[in-house]
From Swiss-Prot:
Protein name: Ubiquinone biosynthesis protein COQ4, mitochondrial
Keyword field: Lyase, Membrane, Metal-binding, Mitochondrion, Mitochondrion inner membrane, Transit peptide, Ubiquinone biosynthesis, Zinc
Coiled coil: none
Extent of the signal sequence: none
Subunit structure: Component of a multi-subunit COQ enzyme complex, composed of at least COQ3, COQ4, COQ5, COQ6, COQ7 and COQ9.
Annotated EC: 4.1.1.130
Pathway annotation: Cofactor biosynthesis; ubiquinone biosynthesis
Protein role: Lyase that catalyzes the C1-decarboxylation of 4-hydroxy-3-methoxy-5-(all-trans-polyprenyl)benzoic acid into 2-methoxy-6-(all-trans-polyprenyl)phenol during ubiquinone biosynthesis.
UniProt-annotated binding residues for Zn(2+): 153-154, 157, 169
Length: 267
C-alpha cells in the first residue's frame, strides 16, 4: 500500500512554530505564518477588502496568503520556462520612480509605451512607489515574483486604459486572473456587489467578456520586461502581446452621467 506524502511545508508549519518561537525570516521583511495564521489572514483580508475595496493593504495580504502553496509556484515556473522571464528573475528589476525616470517617459513620443504609462500615472494621480513589499510568501524567489506582479499592475492599467475606480479595478483583476491564475485576482469578482446598477450592467455586458477573452488570449504578462520596451509603439506592443483594448471606461461613465442629467432636466 502506497503511503500518503505530506508536503514538507505543512509538516514544518505544524510543529515547533508559535508566536513566541517563530522561524527565522527567509528575506528582509519576511513574516513566516502557520497554516492557521495564513487561513485566518486570508479570510479576514477577503472580508475586509470586500467591505472596503480601497484598502490596498488588505488586498495585498489576500494576494499573498492565497498564492501558496501552488499558484505562485506556477507563475514562477512560467517565468523559468520563458527566456525573458528567466532574465527578469536573474536581474530582479524594480519598478519605482527611482528606477524609471518619469520626466524622460513624458518626453517620449505620445504613442510610446513610456509616454502612455506616464500619462496614465498623471491622469490617475498615482505613483509607482505605492506598492507594498511582500511579507507572507516563504520562498524568497516566489516573493520576488509576487512583488514583480504587484509592480507591473500599473503597466496593465496603462496598456488597457482602465482607470482606478472600483469598476476599472474589477475588470483588470479578472483580466489578471485569466492571465496569471492568482486566486486573489479571481476572488475580486465578489466586488461586483459594490457596483451600482449601470456599472454592474456594463461589467456583465462589456468588461467581463473583454477581461476573460483578452486575459486568456494574451501572452504571460509576468514575462514581459516592461522597462526594456518603453520606447516601443504601444499599439504594436499590444498586438504583439495579444492585448485587446476595452471600450473607454471613462468615456462610457461620462456619457452615462450626461444621459442621467438630461433625463432629470426633461422631467
Amino acid at each position: 500500500m502506497s503511503r500518503l506524502k505530506i508536503p514538507s511545508q505543512l509538516l514544518r508549519g505544524g510543529r515547533g512554530f508559535s508566536v513566541l518561537s517563530r522561524p527565522a525570516a527567509n528575506y528582509a521583511g519576511h513574516v513566516p505564518l502557520t497554516p492557521v495564521e495564513r487561513c485566518t489572514m486570508a479570510v479576514g483580508s477577503a472580508i475586509g477588502s470586500l467591505l472596503n475595496p480601497r484598502r490596498h493593504d488588505l488586498i495585498a495580504t489576500l494576494g499573498e496568503t492565497t498564492a501558496t502553496p501552488y499558484f505562485i509556484y506556477r507563475l514562477r515556473d512560467a517565468m523559468l520556462s520563458d527566456p525573458t522571464g528567466r532574465r527578469i528573475l536573474r536581474d530582479r528589476p524594480r519598478i519605482t520612480s527611482q528606477t524609471l525616470s518619469l520626466p524622460y517617459l513624458r518626453s517620449l513620443p505620445p504613442t510610446s509605451l513610456g509616454a502612455t504609462f506616464a500619462s496614465w500615472l498623471d491622469r490617475e494621480g498615482v505613483s509607482p512607489d505605492t506598492r507594498s513589499r511582500v511579507r507572507y510568501i516563504d520562498d524568497e524567489e516566489c516573493a520576488y515574483v509576487m512583488q514583480r506582479y504587484r509592480e507591473c499592475h500599473d503597466f496593465y492599467h496603462a496598456v488597457t486604459g482602465l482607470p482606478i475606480v472600483v469598476e476599472g479595478e474589477l475588470a483588470l483583476k479578472i483580466f489578471e486572473y485569466m492571465n496569471t491564475g492568482l486566486p486573489m485576482t479571481g476572488l475580486s469578482a465578489a466586488a461586483v456587489v459594490r457596483l451600482k446598477g449601470a456599472e454592474r450592467q456594463r461589467f456583465w455586458d462589456v468588461y467581463l467578456p473583454w477581461a476573460v477573452r483578452s486575459g486568456a488570449g494574451s501572452k504571460e504578462l509576468i514575462c514581459v520586461y516592461w522597462e526594456e520596451l518603453l520606447e516601443r509603439d504601444v499599439g504594436e506592443l499590444r498586438a504583439e502581446l495579444g492585448i485587446e483594448v476595452p471600450p473607454d471606461m471613462r468615456e462610457m461613465r461620462r456619457r452615462h452621467r450626461k444621459q442621467k442629467q438630461q433625463e432629470k432636466q426633461e422631467k
